[in-house]
Design a protein with these regions (language model features):
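Short loop/turn segments immediately following the C-termini of beta-strands
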Residues: 8-10, 56-58, 100-102, 110, ...
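Short loop/turn segments immediately following beta-strands, especially the blade-tip
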Residues: 19-26, 66-69, 107-117, 163-169, ...
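A short beta-strand motif characteristic of beta-propeller blades
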Residues: 29-35, 71-77, 120, 126-131, ...
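Blade-loop segments of beta-propeller domains
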Residues: 30-92
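Beta-rich, blade/repeat-based domains predominating
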Residues: 37-48, 79-90, 126-146, 178-193, ...
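Asp-box/WD-like beta-propeller blade repeats and closely related beta-sheet repeat scaffolds
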Residues: 72-140
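Loop-centered beta-sheet repeat module
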Residues: 149-204
């Protein structure tokens, strides 16, 4: 099967890459440049094969739309820094983006050919106590299981939820205040329980949230992603939940590790292990479709690590860490 990598293009990378992944052995091979683009740091596929990236142009940042053959459809750009997150809403025919530097959430309408037109945008206002929280920093914009739009804002320690109509117009619904200085980055929902796991970048924690199904979140538990004796820099990055809802995985940049948690009966978390990611700055990772493997992309060491996964206890065993992908910061199937 094919596996895709989004990258920074500050050093040697040229854009979006694709490789072959052997679902039986976990072996990676045949890396190829799929799309030449500046800093396509996050990617999202539509079911029809269209690909959306947050790559930048000389005119500014935005979202680029490509067809199933990786041919550019259009690039919706506005002045300023590029976006950091993109997601597809199949039911409404929309695409969502998050702009970290501007604190914006953007909504685009998909056209018949898959190209995009900007439909709406909102700008968050706020700040936090950490030095990286001088202003709002939207880092994630995606759907709840009941189809509200939820946005994590690292700058003002909040989750915002919005109603979205069929035209992509947003209506503010609710907000959740995380621990001051936590820096909410990404959110992952449990597949069956009314629970969400909030990845907090700045204090290296996961906040386990009760989700009432109407856009409202309530804190149930806070748990660290680091060993108790770690005192150096760390910023968490990606979070994933296994398909069976039994385990949660989180990446640490700085400690350069993957934290493994067991989901208990009430959906709270218990640490299982923290394993080296065998690279520098594991900004993103993904579970293979059958959840037998976990694949980690490293931004600063240009390598990809493949772990096999014990589905009974969640533990990871490294298979390889020598497949080279330059400046990889996003990985998806």
């Amino acid at each position: 099967m094919k596996i895709y990598f989004g990258t920074y293009t500050k050093r040697s990378s040229e854009g979006v890459y694709v490789a072959d992944f052997d679902a039986n052995t976990g072996e990676l091979s045949n890396l190829e440049l799929l799309i030449k683009e500046n800093n396509p740091t996050y990617l999202s596929f539509a079911k029809d094969g269209a690909l959306y990236t947050v790559g930048a142009t000389e005119a500014g940042g935005g979202i680029a739309a490509y067809d199933a053959n990786a041919q550019l459809l259009n690039h919706v750009v506005e002045e300023g820094a590029p976006l950091c997150y993109v997601a597809v809403d199949e039911d409404r025919g929309l695409v969502y983006g998050a702009n970290y530097h501007k604190g914006q959430v953007l909504v685009y309408k998909r056209q018949a050919d898959g190209s995009l037109v900007l439909a709406d945008q909102v700008k968050h206002i706020g700040s936090g106590p950490h030095e990286n929280q001088a202003s709002a920093h939207a880092h994630y914009a995606d759907l709840t299981p009941d189809k509200y739009l939820v946005a994590c804002d690292l700058g003002c320690d909040k989750i915002f939820t919005y109603k979205v109509d069929s035209d992509g117009q947003l209506e503010a619904l609710a907000s959740y205040q995380s621990t001051p200085g936590a820096g909410p980055r990404h959110l992952a929902f449990h597949p069956t329980a009314k629970i969400a796991y909030l990845m907090c970048e700045l204090n290296s924690t996961i906040e386990v949230l009760i989700y009432d199904g109407l856009g409202h979140f309530e804190l149930m538990q806070t748990i660290s992603t680091l060993p108790e004796d770690h005192t150096g820099f760390n910023g968490t990055a990606a979070i994933r939940v296994s398909n069976d809802g039994q385990f949660v995985y989180a990446s640490n940049r700085g400690h350069d590790s993957i934290a493994v948690f067991k989901v208990l009966g009430d959906a709270s978390l218990e640490l299982v292990e923290i394993v080296s990611s065998h690279g520098k700055t594991p900004r993103d990772f993904i579970l293979s479709p059958d959840n037998q493997f976990l694949i980690v992309a490293h931004q600063d060491s240009d390598n990809v690590t493949v772990f096999s996964r014990n589905v009974e206890n969640g533990k990871l065993t490294e298979i390889s860490h020598d497949f080279q992908v330059p400046e990889a910061v996003c990985v998806l199937f």
